[in-house]
Amino acid sequence: MADRNDTGLLAPAERDLRLDLMRGIGQWMVFLDHIPYDIVSWLTLRNYGFSDAAEFFVFISGYTAGFVYGPAIANRQFLAAAKRLLKRAWQLYIAHIFLFLFFIAQISRAARRFDNPMYGNEYNIFLFLEHPDVMIGQALMLKFKPVDLDVLPLYIVLVLALPAILWGLFKRPAWTLLGSAIFYVLARIFDWNLPSFPSGNWYFNPFAWQLLFVFGAWCGITKAAKITTLIRSRAVMILALAWIAFSFLIVMTWHVPFLDALVPKWMIHIIYPIDKSDLDMFRLLHFLALAVVFVRYVPSSWPMLHSRVLRPLILIGQNSLPIFCLGVFLSFAAHWFLVQIEGDVVAQILVSVAGMMLMVAVAWVLNRFKALPDHFALPKAPAPERAV
């Protein structure tokens, strides 16, 4: 989310390729999860635990923002950092609106060209096609969102709040974290959320998901130094592995009917519903458990991070926003193709692999494009000489 290319404002920092790796893996998972009935999507995290790629994206976005903009706040450049963050929020908003328009066009063309209204109903654009004059205004206010376009509005709201969050984490970190946790609890108790149109609320409740984002920003500012001992303790590792195993067993009951009967009724009442919209605590704990294991066994100096094997995923992670937008189009294109040909398992695998490889190719092109020298950049004015 933060722009690592900002110079002059931000202190130079070595890039943690683990973040790019996890963003790249997350982009592949989102692409596969957005293809209905795709057998390859069984490889994604949501089928084996409470959390999924959404938790990773929100945490990493917060961590990166804290890591990148924290030094600016510390150097009393709050206004400059706030200006940069507001500009970033505007960029995300423009990206969302363009993605919305092209996505609507893609789905509506498929629905009309192949006389299949199922696409309009599946992706929640049927009302837009009937009343475009009303719905475009609601879309501009982020109240109307087709299926699969919920995450960027969440980021926009979080980035808008980021200057205040970073200031609080720098001045009063304990109180800011406590306030975030209290806000999360109150939002869940009183059902606080932003309204959607024509009915309902936001799929990703920003009042709940801010907790993970704020925690990520705090970890980024402090480089997680204050919890390093806790993360590396044997007791925390055992608890993390136990929670991951428990989550796996519960999720398996969703897929294997006879396992469901083995879960006590009292436990069912405690566990469910495991709500994604309001960031259920079980999902949050599962993500934190995975993060503990990942940080423990994948250090930032891991040689594989510089290998050719992981390079494609890291490239995707380094171009997260454009690749996410591309993935939205590719997931619908894959769904459309499989519906039209009534694709079998082989077709599902081929389409999924082709989409993932295309994401890698586009990420490679974007990286090459960014590496090109800017021959039209204005030369910097020489610094004024000091009087002796």
Where are these regions (language model features)?
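Alpha-helical transmembrane segments and their immediate juxtamembrane cytosolic regions
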Residues: 1-388
